[in-house]
Amino acid sequence: MEQAYCTAVFWRGGEKIDLNGLKPDAVRCLSVTGERKVNLSFLRDYPNLEELTLMEKCEGVEVLSELKQLHTLSLWLSAPVSWDNVSLPGLRVLHLRGEKNGDITPLLSSITNLHLEEMRKTEDLTPFLTPATRLQKLYLQSLPAVQKLPALDGLPSLYALKLYELHKLSDLSALSHSHLR
């Protein structure tokens, strides 16, 4: 049975954490929203997190390396963070929304599912795809500046590609050299 998302909301005047009656070590899915900058060290209390959504402002992402069960990460940050000291070998799904998530290259080597969304200024997708050699599913949504798909031949396991609202996309020649079945 799929667990509902628990929520942690932080604003200037306080915070509210709703665990749906669960103890922290029983929480598998958590959504964190920070209208003020949130130090993520509190996530140490949630060692069994499998899915995590981070929105708005946060710091201390290094703590994510301690979440050994984490396989799905969604980011929609309003201020970039450094991912250089974060190791997530179990991460399989990465959902990026917006362009202020920082250089996420260190997160890409193990993922099999990548969703890029609402990146208004991003023209070249190559920096996201080159390190993601295990990628199986790629979802591209609301990327208005993308005119051309990058080479996909370096993604031998890619079998699913979804394109949605890429209004300037005019060059699909990369598909002919891909491993898509």
Locate each region found by the language model.
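Concave beta-strand-loop units of leucine-rich repeat
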Residues: E2-D18, K23-V63, Q69-Q147, A151-S170, ...
